[in-house]
Amino acid sequence: MQPAERSRVPRIDPYGFERPEDFDDAAYEKFFSSYLVTLTRRAIKWSRLLQGGGVPRSRTVKRYVRKGVPLEHRARVWMVLSGAQAQMDQNPGYYHQLLQGERNPRLEDAIRTDLNRTFPDNVKFRKTTDPCLQRTLYNVLLAYGHHNQGVGYCQGMNFIAGYLILITNNEEESFWLLDALVGRILPDYYSPAMLGLKTDQEVLGELVRAKLPAVGALMERLGVLWTLLVSRWFICLFVDILPVETVLRIWDCLFNEGSKIIFRVALTLIKQHQELILEATSVPDICDKFKQITKGSFVMECHTFMQKIFSEPGSLSMATVAKLRESCRARLLAQG
C-alpha cells in the first residue's frame, strides 16, 4: 500500500490506541466501510429503544446487545444490565469514602508497579497527556482494593479497569462495573487462589473434549495444560489479545449474559482454527498456534465474529456451565 493510502486510516484509533506498524490498513478499510453502515443502523434502533429511559431485560434487548451497543450508549447500557447502576444508586458517596480510607502501602505499591505497564500504546495513559488516565486508573484500582480486601489487587484487573475508564470516562462508574465483573460475573477469578479462573480453564477443557474431540485428544497426547494457553484470555477478558472493537462487543454480551460468553468466544476461536491447531506436534508449537488464532481478519471483523460465537459452539446453557464448574472445582480441590 502506498504511503498516501496508508494515511487514510488514522494511526491512533478512536480509543487512543496507536495502530501497530504491521496493521493491515486495506483489510481494516474494507471491513469498516461495511461495518459503519451496520453501526449507523444499530445506533438509530438503540436511540429509539432508549427513549423510554430504561434498559429493560427482554428478548429484544438481548438481541440488540448481541448485535452491538453503540459507543455513545455503551456506558449506560453496561451500567444497567450489569447491576452496577443499581449498586451505585444504593451506595451514594461510597466510592469517595473508599479513596479517603486508611492507607494500605502494599496495595498502593502493587497498583503503582503496574500503571506504566498498562496500555503503553495508548496516548491517553501516557504521563505526557493531560489529563493522564493513569491517575484515574490508580484511583479505581485502589478503591476496589479497599472495597474487596479478599482480592485486593491482581494483575489483569488493570487492563479491565483501563477499558472501563475508556468507555465510561467516569471513575465511579468504572469502579462499580469492575465490581460487577470481579464480584459477581467472574467470582474467584482474581482471589489469591484464583480457584474460579482455574475452574473455568478446566471447564473449557471439558467443553473442547465434548465439542472438538480431535483438539481435546491432541491436548492430552501432548500433555498441555489449558492454563498455559488461555489464562490470559480469561484473566484479561481478551484485552490486549483480540482487537479493541471485538473485545467491546464481547463485553456487551458479557455484562448481559454472564460468563458463558467467555466459553463461547474461546470455543469459536478454537473451532474456527481447528485444522491449524491440529498441525501442532509439540507444546511450544501449540502455544504458537494459540497466539496465531487471535490475529487476522476473522477476529477483526467483529460483527461476523460475534455472529459466529452464537452459532459455532452450538448449545451452551448456564446450567451446563454450572454443572461442569461443580465437577471441575471438586476435582481441583481434591488435588489440593
Curated annotation (Swiss-Prot):
Keywords for this protein: GTPase activation
Asked if Repressor is a keyword of the record, the answer is: no
Entry's Gene Ontology cellular component terms = cytoplasm; plasma membrane
Please list which residues make up the signal peptide.
none
Q: Which Pfam families does the UniProt entry name for this protein?
A: RabGAP-TBC
Q: Which InterPro entries did the record assign?
A: Rab-GAP-TBC_dom, Rab-GAP_TBC_sf, Rab_GAP_TBC_domain
UniProt function note = May act as a GTPase-activating protein for Rab family protein(s).
Name of this protein: Growth hormone-regulated TBC protein 1
Species this protein is from:
Homo sapiens (Human)
The record's gene field reads GRTP1
